Amino acid sequence: MTHEERIRAAWQGRISGCLLGKPVEMISMREGPQGLNTFLQDSGSLPLRNYVNYMEHELLRGANKRCCLGMMERAEVDDDITYLVLALMMMEQYGLDLSTDDVARSWINL
């Protein structure tokens, strides 16, 4: 496997992982592990072998809802992925001289 193929596979894995967890991100944060397990069980998503099935839930809406199995049309914007891309851009621009001011300006100019 070439270096380019490895980097591409790493990005695909990272984006796929973010999409896999996006539907239940708020459920797990607000309701904890038990709430997450209950949702996954009730939605028929366990054992987890694919993307999460859609089921009505007050915390499952917008982009999170669009990341459910059968509802995806594209990779939705994700703050974790945005941060990784921005971090790469900042390292390319500032290198080891990167400062907290550079980070603040980069976020504002994004």
What are these regions (language model features)?
Residues 1-110:
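Structured, active/binding-site neighborhoods that engage oxygen-rich ligands
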